[in-house]
Amino acid sequence: MMEKHFVGSEIGQLRSVMLHRPNLSLKRLTPSNCQELLFDDVLSVERAGEEHDIFANTLRQQGVEVLLLTDLLTQTLDVPDAKTWLLDTQISDYRLGPTFAADIRAWLADMSHRELARHLSGGLTYGEIPASIKNMVVDTHDINDFIMKPLPNHLFTRDTSCWIYNGVSINPMAKPARQRETNNLRAIYRWHPQFADGDFIKYFGDENINYDHATLEGGDVLVIGRGAVLIGMSERTTPQGIEFLAQALFKHRQAERVIAVELPKHRSCMHLDTVMTHIDIDAFSVYPEVVRPDVQCWTLTPDGHGGLKRTQENTLVHALEKALGIDQVRLITTGGDAFEAEREQWNDANNVLTLRPGVVVGYERNIWTNEKYDKAGITVLPIPGDELGRGRGGARCMSCPLERDGI
């Protein structure tokens, strides 16, 4: 019987996901700060919200439970220890000074939990605090400077945490613009009633410490099932992070092998799921660059002494066939000619969310790739993404599965 908070594959029946509807954080994205906050462009937040609602409703119509991050965070703040911990971690004495930080924490603590959750994701400016809070730090900042920077990348719930079989990795993020996101998830998984007493493993990242180069993001992690996990070694996920996760998976006997594939270190291949997703028992959507014969790939297995055995694979495709017990995997490549394929990969044609074998959610704008899916027997449930797509993330990026069947 399916256990709650169990993700057994990428393609089994999807039962529950966590999403984050566009909110204040994206309203604070501007041409002058979007690069620092890891966006290429600014979005029409109202339209992005409408598109996100269509995405969420598409999932609900397919029988998927949709939980919203802001709701979970608001409910987590009802737990006094969670509220204190979040205020202490998000409002640092060393960054703001002890007296100013204490005043800000006290003011935030008196807010409604809904409003506090809004600021924990959307940020806080000096112009929003009451005039009664006086400090040299205040005197030396403009009203539009941030006390807490916004977290617009919370939109991509896939990255901050990822459920793998009977547990979760709460991921240390690579970029400063995203590192505070993880604390919001740490609090939810530690104190929210839905998770606090849950029988699941925390593999990695639960402590609020400096993980240095051991970074990991969920967009690089594919739970391909049958005891295997595929992880992309990208600009965000490092060999060090992969080793920590692999050791934890093997220690808790949750996986038999971890396949690590080296990705090109550029923006369009930010995560593995921007170039590759699992869409049917034997089928993957791929941008051809990731399955070139010269792409390095390794399989990690337990060495029997708490360490890792590393085996160099000839190709990623061969490693996948061995892991899944399949004679030949089908590769459905990005559609169109070379120009159209590059454009559609940039617009997340390969970043689809599989609801069950052969049924995916993806952006309607990727007409050439969607046509190839259809010819391959894959059903695409189309959603609009003219604004959401500006964030460089598709349906998989914007969803964190909490419960999914195995294969």
From Swiss-Prot:
Range of residues in the leader sequence: none
Pfam families cross-referenced by the UniProt entry: ADI
Top-level taxon of the source organism: Bacteria
EC number: 3.5.3.6
Subcellular location as annotated: Cytoplasm
Annotated keywords: Arginine metabolism, Cytoplasm, Hydrolase
Active-site feature positions: C397 (amidino-cysteine intermediate)
Pathway assigned to this chain's UniProt record: Amino-acid degradation; L-arginine degradation via ADI pathway; carbamoyl phosphate from L-arginine: step 1/2
Catalytic activity: L-arginine + H2O = L-citrulline + NH4(+)
Predominant subcellular localization, coarse grouping: cytoplasm
Gene Ontology terms describing biological process: arginine catabolic process to ornithine; arginine deiminase pathway
Gene Ontology CC annotations of this record: cytoplasm
Gene3D superfamilies reported for this sequence: Arginine deiminase (1.10.3930.10), L-arginine/glycine Amidinotransferase, Chain A (3.75.10.10)
PANTHER family: ARGININE DEIMINASE (PTHR47271:SF2)
Family: Belongs to the arginine deiminase family.
Top-tier EC class: hydrolase
UniProt-listed SUPFAM superfamilies: Pentein (SSF55909)
Gene this chain is encoded by: arcA
TM region positions: none
Gene Ontology molecular function, alphabetical: arginine deiminase activity
InterPro entries, A to Z: Arg_deiminase (IPR003876)
Name this polypeptide is given: Arginine deiminase
